[in-house]
Amino acid sequence: MIRVTCLGGTGTVTGSSFLIESSQGKKVLVDCGLFQGGKQIEERNWQDWGFDPKQIQTLFLTHAHIDHSGKIPKLVKDGFQGRIITSPPTAELCTIMLMDAAHIQEMDAEWQTRKNKRQSHGELSLIHI
């Protein structure tokens, strides 16, 4: 038997991610997308996964769009060590897009940290690729 859990891309058009679990204990994640939109939607990027990333054997990436690939750095940071299956063009594009997204997030975090310090809220932590 196979169980499919929709983790994103439902109720919103971003954050595409589906967990497929077999009765033999195999776990495959299809896409690992970033939630985009308003503040309330984007806060979902920092919520608990609902599964242990260390237990995922394979990430199957359908394409490079950030709403399908943007949380890969967080997945790795949180313990994913499995293989990633995707097409060569998607792998190439993801390398470029995720590095660019990391740079933008660093700039956003620096701005937010300066703002937080002025308001006594402290620094933000980044997920490094």
Q: Language-model features: where?
A:
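Extreme N-terminal starter segment of soluble prokaryotic enzymes
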Residues: 1-3
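Short Gly/Pro-enriched turn/cap motifs at secondary-structure boundaries
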Residues: 8-10
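Pre-active-site segment of Zn-dependent metallo-hydrolases
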Residues: 12, 22-61, 65-82, 86, ...
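Residue-level marker for the onset of beta-strands and adjacent loop->beta junctions
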Residues: 14-16
